[in-house]
Structure formats: C-alpha cells, structure tokens
Amino acid sequence: MLLRIARITTIAAFLATAFLAPASGADTDPALDAPLPLSPQVKVGKLANGLSYYIHQNRKPEHKLELRLVVKAGSILEDEDQLGLAHFTEHMAFNGSRHFRKHELISYLQSIGVKFGADLNAYTSFDETVYVLPLSAERSEDLDRAFLVLQDWAQGLTLNDADIDKERDIILEELRLGKGAGDRMQKVLMPKIYNGSRYARRLPIGQEETLRRFKPDALRRFYRDWYRPDLMAVVVVGDIAPAKAEQLIKRHFDGMQNPANERPRTYAAIPPRTDSEALVVTDKEAGSAGILIRYPVQAFQDRQTIGGYREQLVETLFSGMLNGRLQELSQLPSPPFMGASSALGRLTPRYRSWNVSASLGTSGPAAAIDAVVQENERARRFGFSATELERVKKTLMRTYERAWNERDKTDSSVYAAEYMRHFLEGESVPGIDAEYRYVSELVPGIGLDEINAYARRTIPDNSGKLVVYTGPAQAGTPLPTGEQLLAAVTAAERREVGAHAEKAVASALMDKPPAPGGIVAETRDERLGLTRLTLSNGVKVILKPTTFRNDQVLMSAARFGGQSLFDDKDMFSARYADTIVAAMGLKDFSPLDLRKVLAGKAAAVSAGLGNNTDIVAGTAGASDVETMLQMVWLKFAGVRRDEGLYQSYIGKQMELARNRQSQPGALFGDTMVATLYGNNPRAPRALRPEDIPRIDLDRAIDIYRQRFSSAKDLTFIFVGSFDPAAIKPLLATYLGSLPTPDIPTAYRDLGVRPVKGVVRREVNSGLEDKSTVALTFTGPAEVTEMEELRLSAMTEIMNIRIIDVLREKLGLIYGGGMEGSMTRVPYAHYTVGVTLPTGPENVDKVLKAAFAEIERMRTQGPDQADLDKVKTNWLQTYRKSLQENSYWLAVLQTSLTEGTDPGTILSFDREVRSIGVADVKRAAQRYLNTENYVQVVLNPEK
C-alpha cells in the first residue's frame, strides 16, 4: 500500500505499526472477501527461474530511475561459521565482480552522477538484503550498465580471498563504530525480546571473533546458497518505458540458475511467551531511561482482501485514539513519562506483538508503568468517545486525500519501497486510486461499537509478558528490581479506572477573521516566476506558484535579530523562548486543544529565534492555507502562559541534559566547542544541567513578545500549489493585519570567533575501545556563490579521497568525512570540519593519512576525474531540485538573509561547469590552512 496504513505519521504522528486480526463478521460479507486488486501502475512478473520483477513508469523526478535488487536472505540464514557474513556479502558487492574490478564499480557509478552512500547504498537485515541504485535515465548505455551492476550483485561477485581479507578491517571498524551503551544493552535484551529464538543469535553485524577468523569459503557458501533467482526481485521505478525495462531485466537475469540441491528458505519461529518476567538493563553511558512491556508474539500474515484492508483501517483508527491519549498524558504539568506508545507492532515480517513503551522523565518507571497500563485498561474496558473517533477519522481521511492529490507527483523512491514490501512481506499494492476509494467508502461505516469491540479483543489483560527497564547506572539514582517492575504492572492492571473524560474544545482557531489590511504595491519577476507584494502594514510577500506538487504550500519568513540581541544573562531564556512558548500552546489553545482543533487539517507553523535571525516557517495542504495563515496571525497575537506546562517542559529538558552527560560524545562535543571558541560563553554549545536554573519563564515570554509582537521587516515567501489571485485576499487579511511597531531588526555581532593557530586537545571518555579524530579549519572569507561552490567541490572531492584511501586502501575507518560552509552573518567566514571515527591504535595513522590527503589537495589539486564525478552529481541533483518547492524556498530565503541574487538559481549549471582543477586547488590552499586549525581527539577512558 502506498501509504502503508500502519505507518502513516506525516500529519498527526498517531499511527501504530502492523496489521490486525479479522473483524467480527467480515468473512461473511462477499464484498469484503474480494481480493485487493494489484495497482494497474505496476507490472509484476516472474522469470522462468523464479526471479520476480516490478516495473512502474513514473516521471517524478524526470529522467531518473530507481533500481533495487531485493534478496530474501539475511543474517537469519547464516550457519554457525557465518555469523555476520550476510552483511559481509553485501560489502563485497562493491569490491569486485565479473564485469567490474575492485573499486571500478564505485568509480564508474560516481562518474555518471551516483554518489556513494547518499545514492548508491545497501542494507542487510535479519530476513533480507537490499541493494539501492538510483541513476539518471538519460543515456541508454548507462541504463544497460546499471542492469549489469544488478546482474553482478545477483550472481557475479568474485569474492576472492585477498579482497575478503582486506574488507575485514572495514567491517571491524563498522562493528567498532556501533559499540557503546546501546550495543551492550542490546546484547542483554535480544535473547529476551526474541524469546530465545534464532533471531537473538543472528544480529546482522555478526560477532567479532567470526569476522576476524572466518574462512573465505564460508562467505562464498552463503552467497552460493542464498543469492539465487527464486529468492530475488528486481524493482524498476522511474522514467523508463516498461517494455524497455522488461527487456533489460530479461537480458540480464533470464540466464541465471538456481543451485542444484538448493537449501530450503525457512523462516525462524519465535515461541510465544508463557510466563511473565522482568529485566533491568543499565549502562553507565546510557543516554535515556525507558520501559518496555512486550506481550506474547502472534504469527501474522497480511490478508490481501478488501475485508483485510478494512481491518487495517480499524486498527489505524484505534491506534490513533489510544496513542492520542498517551500524548495527552505526556503534556500534563507533571507527566508520568516524556513520551509513550501502545500498539501492535511488527517484530519480524511474520510476527507481531502488543507493545507498550515509554521514555522516562523525573517521575520514574513505576509512574510510567501505572499510566500506560491504566490507559490500556481504560480503553479495553470503556472504549473511546464519538468525538475521539471523529477526529481521528478526519485526520486519516485528510492524509489519504493528500496522497491521492499527489498521485502523479509521488517520488519513484516511494513506489520502489512499496514494491519491496510487497515482495518481502506480502503487503498489498492496490494503488492510491483504489486505496482512496476504499478509505472513502469504508471509514464512514466504521462505528464506535466496532472500535471498542476491537479494543477489548486486542489489548492484552493478564497475558505472559516481558517487562524491561533500560537506563543509565548513575550514582545516587535508585533502580527498580525485576520484581518491582512486575508488581507495578500487576497493580496497574488491577486498579480501578474510569472512562476517559473528553473536554469540549472550539471548532475553529478563530471566531472571525481580523480586520484586513490591503495590498499597496505589486511587481512581477517574469524570469523567476515571482510576484512581489507590499502590504499596507509594510510586510512584504513573495509568491512563487508551482506545479511541482499538487497539495503542498511552503512558507518562510526571516529577519535579522534573534538571540544576538540579548545579553549573556538572558542567553538561555532567549535560546529556549520559542520552544517554551510553543510547549504552552498557541494563543488561547493548549497544545492538546490545538491538536484537536487541527484534526483533519494539514497545516503547521513555527516561530523561532535563531542566533542572528527571527524565523517563521509553515507548511500546508493546498486547501489549508488559510488555517496556516491563521496560525501565523495567532503567533503574533500573544502568549499563553501555563506554569504547569512550563514545569513539564523544563523537567524534560533537565532529564535530557542529565542523560546527555553520561554519553562519551557529550564531553567530546563540549570540548570541541570550548576549544574552538576559546571558552566564549556565547559559543553554540549543548545545554547542561547547571544551565537550567538560568532559564526564566517570564523572561522567556518577554523575549518572545519582543520579537514576535511585531512583523516589521518580515518578508513572507510562499512556494507551492496555490493560485495567486485566490491567496491574495487571505494574505491581506492575516498578514496585512499583523502589528508592525518599531523593533530592532539588525543582528548584533557578539564577537564569537575561533582561536587562531594550531590547537590540539585530547579527551578521554567512554568505555569502548574507540576513538574519534576531529579537525576544524576556520578563517575569514570572501563569500560569493562561486566561492561557496569551490569550497563545496573541494570537500566533496576530499570525501572521495578519504573513502578511497583511509577506508578502502588503509582500512582505518568505516565512515566519516569532511564538510564545509560559508556565511556572511555575523561576519564573513568559512568553517571546514573533518570527523574520522577509528580505533585508539589507529589515531596517529588516521591523522597522518588525513593530512597527507590535505597536503596532496593543496599542492597537486584534485584529479580531473574526481572533479567530473562531483560536477555530474551536482548537475543531476540540480535538475531534480528545480522541481522541488523546498529548493526554491531555500534559495529565495537565502537571497534575503545573505543578500544574494536569487537569479543564480537559473545559472547554477553554468557556474558548476566553470569550476576547474585549479579552482579547487586554490580553495584547498585557502581553506585547509595547516597553520590554523583545531584538533580534538576522543580516546577511551584511561
């Protein structure tokens, strides 16, 4: 299903995962027994050797193609001498094959604009391995070679001993990178979560001892056994004729054969839990505390009938209402948890279970357990109200309406993911036309009695369960015992609960619109397709109507000011003023009431203080622009002060700050900022527990009011699917009536500057044998569009070199790289950062290799081939971005805050083509100044 009912989260963030058991009486209705159709947009076929294929012609984006090779084989199929080799096989797909020598594949794909990691990628899970290859569809020779790549991945990997042994170092670095509190706690949890099944012993990353010592034949055996046509699918979605795609599939895959005496592809069973048990898992470096209650697993298979689809809608509505109640609890003045969810969730493709989880705040595990279990019991015993059901129906219907509106503007990658799920999980793919029709016909007929019966049938009562507490082991912090966790659940299940009390709320954001202003000036920019308006209160507007999407309008506005206008004593009140105000609601609406009023609306608005700017941003569906504008107006109309919600917000911030302190990265990050900026108090560091008392509610409200009681000097930009003639009266009403009293609209340069010279620091933090090298180069810059491009070209080419040398040649890292930026505000300067995770024993080698590549770039410049790879990728990305509302909005907004010419959006390709090797070399000499940088190295605790 295009929307995957159980995963819809974009508008209300209210859905649970998974599907549900048959609703009572559904099987007796002949119409509901009818099978779901297959979307007419996709051609599904199967070759004689068993290989499945999916073909969907789609022109969003134009001239692009999304290819997937999907293999129903993952770590669950590994033999005892193969732990981690499913994932290792995935790595070897990029290290030599029948038609591409080692490293030749990545180099070739980069040459046609495919970026390694960002575009070209793969993943290995328990039950599948998936290879992702997006590319330009403009040249037929590239298409044929792309299918040749898929062919080699499927059955053409060379897997020679030398290449396998060389890849061990990279895999071990990936293993090292994943180590930490989460990994240590997971190893304790997995046997319990999967109830002793094979899944607990088959984590895709594998085991270090096996990865170091396995024999290459073990890896070749895995590839031979499981990479076979009857376990594979090829997915082709994009700007290609279906007949051409099918021809390419048959040419490259028809000749493949399944192995003789093939091993059966079985699926591991997860035994149901019969007795309740509890587990307390702590770690010194854990970054948060939480509870999980997992009820017995249920075998599951998607029912691909209209009745099955209706049952999924019932579950979606039920999950939305139950989790809406949990969200309400999280926003109480003294919440029992920071956030919680309760739903049927997929554990594996063939199993699901009822899960209750909560992230803990200051109230502790007992209060969280009591609250979530009681809320489940309340729903099971008393069900829901008609108003709750009506709200969640509105939201669901609006979500499907927007998806249907965008049916010809849906990205190919979305369809590719849908067809992957069809192959791997049996998910239905009726197409959005059919889905929207079913939802429109079925949802109105789903009544409260049916929902409440589903709740009684679905929410477990006293079943055998696993209760888990996870969190940091901190001195002075009491921890629960397993017995206490079980006792808390039992007590909550037995406690008397009453029906949910539903409070009436207003039906609209505003009783009546404000007295409108007017439009006093209008100009047209034909070159960029812009209309510029000046309203009667001085507010300016830029309109860019597009046809890139059918149901999307984006908005932003910015002016100078922000946190820079406030003194050091107010810095934390200023930093958190916007989020504090948002946490208390909007004008007269509490956050809970606002969510209810906005049910069925696709609109959101935020107002915030950046370091040097005031920012207003919003998004809406085409029919909800007025709602978005009403929210903008209310943002300027006053602040809702709520001491209880403020204390709830501050409590959550304190918990987050405390938990952050236990993580090795916290000390590392703080040291980097302090070292780079010479301990300047206004440097952009993370919040610490000792900073919390410096936040004052009334001062934060006052700061917000100072900046958002006036719309002076704001220019609002609108990009998307709107009619300028229809939107102008709304702009005059809601933006033209905003107050514009005089306020400061210039930023203040606080004098935050990086240190000069070479400064080196070492940080010792963390239990694992892992290190991180960080280099930061800074300095003044002459900021122009061309100079920013030269800097970006340099960093992207350096990343190619870092992967080629530090990863592939030397095996010192798994990931990491370089990034750079320039800005004119508050002063013209550049920043280039390099981050390279590695092992303590390799720190000196990494530094030596990194500086060798820097020196090579400074003295020799880049290889022309590498520069061409970057430019080709940029030009392809640019052509795609030109068809995106978000890109136009970003360019127009940057032109206002940075003072640049928005017309450069039309000359980007010419500017890119003009960049030469000498330009990049000069950029390296200018921006990689080896006499002016900060080096901070994170090593383990001594």
Residue ranges of each PLM-predicted region?
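Hydrophobic, small-residue-rich alpha-helical packing segments that form membrane-like cores
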Residues: 155, 163-177, 181-231, 235-237, ...
